[in-house]
Amino acid sequence: MKTFVAETVKRDWYVVDAAGKTLGRLATELASRLRGKHKAEYTPHVDTGDYIIVINAEKVVVTGKKETDKIYYWHTGYVGGIKDATFKEMISRRPEAVIEIAVKGMLPKGPLGRDMFRKLKVYAGNTHNHAAQQPQVLDI
């Protein structure tokens, strides 16, 4: 059996409404679609995924006590510059970052994963500026 290599990839644009969706369940589906695993021509070493636009990122939910107990950490680069914020604080500061961090952790590390991540567009509100690409509504 010969290995199939996707040379030319047709990429579609999809828009996903994150309002009321659980963060982890949404992120796993987004990561899978960004990799292209839903396509028959999926090849692990080729970026075959689609472009995905996520709207209403500020309305994503988490289960249990994660709203107050889930903590995001980052470092400023200065000595003693460790910072942290709870899920609730992150949603109020930068709601796009919550979905971006969740999806980025599920993608491959390296140049191919970075290319896949660039196809994810996240917006806090209900509007996006990708109408020219004619995105299809994706119900997750």
Curated annotation (Swiss-Prot):
Disulfide bonds: none annotated. GO terms for cellular component: cytosolic large ribosomal subunit. It holds the Pfam family Ribosomal_L13. GO terms for molecular function: mRNA binding; structural constituent of ribosome. One of its GO terms (biological process) is negative regulation of translation. It comes from the Bacteria. CDD domains: Ribosomal_L13. This protein is one of the early assembly proteins of the 50S ribosomal subunit, although it is not seen to bind rRNA by itself. It is important during the early stages of 50S assembly. Part of the 50S ribosomal subunit. This is Large ribosomal subunit protein uL13. It comes from Haemophilus ducreyi (strain 35000HP / ATCC 700724).
